[in-house]
A protein has these predicted regions:
Chain A
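Canonical P-loop GTPase G-domain recognition
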Residues: 186, 192-249
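Short hinge/gating elements
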Residues: 2-5, 112, 187-189, 221-226, ...
């Protein structure tokens, strides 16, 4: 075990931050360290916290961390939300709440959006989760904003997803729920002291009852919270625990771990295979002809891709 | 030229809708038709309209269509936004405004979110744009929500991106601009009759002046609009025209077309190569051993992927 990997296994947060930065930059040295850490991963309970901007995810997260710490659990946070407190975009109150946690050795918070590059977020996020997992954090929360490809990919890689919404968000944001509805294991109606909170709960319940899917055994709870003063946070943590227990008892906890590793592996194969295929092509006249025909629209991209892939052979 | 492709080239909207549905379902028949259409693409001016939910993109879009039609341009719309009017999540006023357009032969609007599947949106979106391009629409607008991998990929594939924001959106949404700032060619401050509009314009101008990038020749304009009654829409369409002219004069219009085709081709190669690699592996004992070691964490996903990719050979 090399020095950096050892430090990270011992919980050294500076070493972990250095490694995550290497991984963000796709540095081979980072991958080498992550390989050494890998056998020590697979123990964390991984949560997703998602919802549109402005619903109070950051404030809720600050209180969630407090409650997890009360229960003697170490908490890691990977914030994929560009508006998360770490990146400086949040309200002063959240920054103060978070500062309390940053002085706690049992809490480690990393934002994946500070470097300004948005591409490849889901890959780097998964790598950061592996690092925090190896460090021994019991609970890892991935905070994402909105709904899109990133969120769906992140949801596929966590054990439990909580979707946060608000009363009175207006038609446009209500419509987003159609996408978020599919990925939620737990639903949170925040700012539940505002008018219309019970209406949102009723609407969600109705939509959830109509939701079709193979996983009919788990009935997603809808938790009302007032994040600003911590109301409902204990109930929310209880709901996370209940879902974890459900996953363990049904064997789905291990299934999701296996599926996550397999998908990550498959994604790596895709990227490495593409690099290998394209790296060796530039000097070949046949490839240059193909690209010329593509650019001049003499050949369509599907036919061009089929031509190239036809020449690929794979043995193991 | 087969029947379906011919109908689409003649502008038949029902045939186009059928084809886009086939492409959403990844049906080989859809790809065959798209191949036939491909030589007829590459003529449209492709715009991206993006911003957080609630900023009034749909209302703005309805007025934009009217103004483009005034200028005798045929307009296609691909709405990647789940809250777009087509999917039924929008305000009644927008639906009425859109209905007027749906009865106009020179307008074609497709939503990519009605089917409820969120994965692979950016690929299907590009395919839908190709279909509309082949149909002869002069302007194609891609409407997306929020900021994420999808938006960045969409921004990479359009000629001109307009980013819409609002006065007084609060800290959290302001922070999102950091991501949106990078991809905007034109910025729109909608609801500019609300207090604080000039402050947002000033902030944006300041942030844009600090924006670093190779493309220093184009100074992104900031347009104030009141979408609900169409104020500023003429100026916005003028800004789109000015950016188009800038792209054409500097050769960037063709460059972006070429880059878009190349990236689409590269993406297809990645997907087809992965399918080819994995399709033939399941029966191989060596592969099954590799997966067993992966699942039991005896081998890490990087090493497993390297092992597999090592055996790939590519000739053309």
């Amino acid at each position: 075990m090399k020095g950096e990997a050892k430090k990270i296994l011992q919980g050294n947060q500076l070493a972990a931050a250095r490694l995550i930065r290497l991984l963000e930059d796709a540095e081979p040295k980072g991958i080498q360290i992550l390989k050494a850490l890998y056998p020590h991963t697979g123990n964390a309970f991984i949560l997703g916290l998602t919802g549109p901007p402005g619903v109070g995810k950051s404030t809720l997260l600050a209180h969630l961390i407090t409650e997890f710490r009360q229960r003697d659990l170490k908490v890691g946070v990977v914030a994929v939300d560009p508006s998360s407190p770490i990146s400086g975009g949040a309200l002063l109150g959240d920054r103060l709440r978070m500062r309390k946690h940053t002085e706690d050795e049992g809490v480690f918070i990393r934002s994946m959006a500070t470097r300004g590059h948005l591409g490849g977020l889901s890959k780097t996020t998964k790598e950061a989760v592996l690092v925090l997992d190896a460090m021994g954090y019991d609970v890892i929360v991935i905070e994402t904003v909105g709904v899109g490809q990133d969120e769906v990919e992140v949801a596929e890689s966590v054990h439990t997803t909580a979707v946060v919404s608000l009363p009175g968000m207006g038609d446009e944001i209500q419509a987003m729920k159609a996408g978020l509805l599919e990925i939620g294991d737990i639903f949170v109606v925040n700012k539940a002291d505002k008018p219309g909170a019970d209406d949102v709960v009723d609407q969600l319940r109705l939509m959830l009852d109509m939701r079709t899917g193979s996983d009919n055994e788990w009935k997603p709870p809808i938790i009302k919270t007032v994040a600003i003063d911590g109301q409902g946070v204990i109930e929310l943590v209880d709901a996370f625990s209940a879902h974890r227990q459900y996953l363990v008892e049904t064997g789905k906890f291990d299934e999701r771990n296996v599926e996550r590793e397999y998908q990550f592996f498959r994604r790596l194969v895709m990227e490495m295979a593409a690099d290998k295929i394209f790296d060796n092509l530039d000097d070949l006249p046949a490839y240059n002809d193909l690209i010329t025909n593509l650019i001049t629209r003499k050949v369509d991209p599907y036919t061009a891709a089929e031509t190239l892939v036809k020449g690929i052979q794979c043995k193991i």
